[in-house]
Amino acid sequence: MMAAMAVLAAPVVRAQQQAQQPKPEETEVWQPVPAVVTPGETPGAPPSDAIVLFDGKNEDEWISAQDHTPAKWIVADGLLTVAKSTGNIETRRHFHNYQLHVEWRIPADITGTGQGRGNSGVFLASTGPGDAGYELQVLDGYNNPTYVNGMVGSIYKQSIPLVNAARKPGEWQSYDVVWTAPVFNADGSLKTPAYVTAFYNGVLVQNHFELKGQTLYVGKPFYKAFDGAAIKLQAHGDKSEPMSFRNIWVRELP
């Protein structure tokens, strides 16, 4: 009798087990559909949703970081070359989170040593005139010793790069950066810190690094509230030959 009941119950048990088995459709997500972005035709070329900050033609997207007058660096032969006497320049637009691509070249005949050799910087958020903000260091890193938290690829005086991927002076180099801006409470206190991931010549040098605040030449970093900021390029005061930039674009992120 018991055996017969077991035989009769078996199909019911199997049916229940099959009903309880997860289905692949239960974990499929169909909405929202990501926007279509057309990649650039070549590596480093701006995708279809990029804001081109320098295309080799003019400085329309840039202003003086000191007084917000039109930028006065040198545009020639498709390049944007630092005019050191005119100071730093920054974007007219302000950004929060973004993906940035920038290419730069230190002259082949560069002179100087250490911090005085091909020095510049990409400030991922400019918080005032001069060097106020959050700097990703630009410097000749090819056989040019300096303090390692100020070498090329560093978050200046906060984070040593994972590796030195520098090319020789005279060769074009690139940064690809993902910037997550800090968020502040209504009273100006920090809610969430800034983070940066950076690739230097295609090599990871900063991996989701949490910044301690603004980058400073002297003193300890600190946060000062802001809501959106320009991207700034540095005209460093060293005496070495000026460097050039090209192909600068940004993609705003959520």
Where do the PLM segments sit?
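Bacterial N-terminal signal peptides
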Residues: 2-9
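Carbohydrate-interacting regions of secretory-pathway proteins
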Residues: 12-254
